[in-house]
Amino acid sequence: MIPNSFPDQAEMARLTAGMLLEIEAVHFNAREPFILASGLPSPTYIDCRKLISFPRIRSTLMDFLTVTVMREAGFEAFDNIAGGETAGIPFGALVAERLALPMTYVRKKPKGYGRDAQIEGVMREGERVLLVEDLTTDGGSKLKFVEAIRKTGATCGHTAVIFSYGIFPETESSLAAEGVKLHHLCTWWDVLAEARARGSFDPETLGAVETFLNDPRAWQEAHKRD
């Protein structure tokens, strides 16, 4: 796999956004907001798990993600690829296959005891591990996985995702504070631009989504349920 034979990052972001729209992984609804795991409302929702059911798109995006990591981290930067339970497991396996590296996965909670209680597969002390997930919002769950990886004696300074919300400034800063670099293919801004170009949603909905993206905390406060 030769990184220079692929599109630049901006074009890969546009193509990724288009593929997510094509498989209807993107949902916008400002009138009846989605409730996130945090309990906060959002007019946007994305389901990257759907990608595993679309082989051509899945393969293309895994090529894109692998190339992005190689461009930004290097050709020989890792010894092990770890998928985060649950959504990151298939994508971790696909990236590991492309890089010809061992694959492991990290549990959300320990199973049993000892420093390897959250790790399935073989992860050796000193190995340089790339954590792969489907998406990130604020980076919080990634740090929990990184902590579990580091407990084994391995190192983890990089995480790769297909989709990053790209609207919460603390995402990359919180990861960076723990020595973790985030690699991603596209954000809500890329999806919004491509949705406008395709006419995927009506102008009122797209306008409401843009308002949210510009100040998500204020939008969430204004749309909180009592």
UniProtKB/Swiss-Prot annotation:
Transmembrane residues, as ranges? none
Gene3D superfamilies recorded for this chain?
3.40.50.2020
What residues bind 5-phospho-alpha-D-ribose 1-diphosphate, as annotated? 107-108, 111, 133-141
Keyword Transferase recorded: yes
State the UniProt keywords alphabetically: Glycosyltransferase, Magnesium, Pyrimidine biosynthesis, Transferase
Query: What does the record give as cofactor?
Result: Mg(2+)
The family database entries (Pfam families) matched by this protein are listed as: Pribosyltran
Question: What EC number is given for this enzyme?
Answer: 2.4.2.10
Reactions catalysed: orotidine 5'-phosphate + diphosphate = orotate + 5-phospho-alpha-D-ribose 1-diphosphate
Pathway named in the protein's UniProt entry: Pyrimidine metabolism; UMP biosynthesis via de novo pathway; UMP from orotate: step 1/2
- State one molecular function term (GO): magnesium ion binding
Q: Tell me which domain of life the UniProt entry assigns to the organism this sequence originates from.
A: Bacteria
Mention one GO biological process in which this protein takes part, according to its record: pyrimidine nucleobase biosynthetic process
- The entry's orotate-binding residues are 137
Keyword Glycosyltransferase tagged: yes
What this chain does, per the entry, is described as: Catalyzes the transfer of a ribosyl phosphate group from 5-phosphoribose 1-diphosphate to orotate, leading to the formation of orotidine monophosphate (OMP).
**Summary of subunit composition and partner proteins:** Homodimer.
Q: Extract the NCBIfam families matched here.
A: PRK00455.1-3, pyrE
* Family from the record: Belongs to the purine/pyrimidine phosphoribosyltransferase family. PyrE subfamily.
| The protein's name in its UniProt record | Orotate phosphoribosyltransferase
What organism does this protein naturally occur in? Answer: Dinoroseobacter shibae (strain DSM 16493 / NCIMB 14021 / DFL 12)
Gene assigned in the entry: pyrE
